[in-house]
Amino acid sequence: MSDHQFTPQDEIFMRRAIEVAKQAEKEGEVPVGAVLVKEGEIISEGWNRSIGSHDATAHAEIESLRKAGQALENYRLLDTTLYVTLEPCPMCAGALLHSRVKRIVFGAPDLKAGAAGTVLNLFESQASYHYADVENGLLEQECRDQLQAFFKRRRKEIKEKRKQDRLLEEQCLESDKASNKNKVCNKK
């Protein structure tokens, strides 16, 4: 981790990552967004797509790396900066190191799987063949708020669905009793 003073340009790119994360949320995915920049220009963007694509590796960072590799026709993404709303997990940290991204800037720490200093730090591991500068905390509260609002809404939806399922089951049981039939209601 570094004690870095963020620039106005850093803030612009992180705000874009927050916007990109909204696309993930629209698709029912965890709202994490990533923007890869080279020489002050966005070369790729990615958002979480794991659920919809049935692909555990389709994290925002990986999606952005894949697009950049195709655009630049090279998996080595030298002299690039990745802005991501949530601290990279171990898988994404490994991909970022392997692709040689020079700088990673993340907003919110990942208290469960953060691999850039919160839980572990793969970027400072002696096992790493490549190194990257990692800076954290840029627009942290906005990134954190976006994720927390999503999970609060998701928990409420799950709770409501369970409540509806219980009511339907109770109605079916009452219906069975009233008709003196020994059958099980079909929940579909």
Segments predicted by a language model, with ranges:
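Zinc-dependent deaminase
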Residues: 1-24, 95-188
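Small-residue (primarily alanine) positions within well-ordered alpha-helices
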Residues: 17, 21-24, 34, 44, ...
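Short beta-strand scaffold segments in enzyme catalytic cores
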Residues: 32-40
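Short beta->alpha transition motifs characteristic of CBS
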Residues: 43-50
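Residues that line or immediately flank small-molecule/substrate-binding pockets and catalytic motifs
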Residues: 50, 84, 108
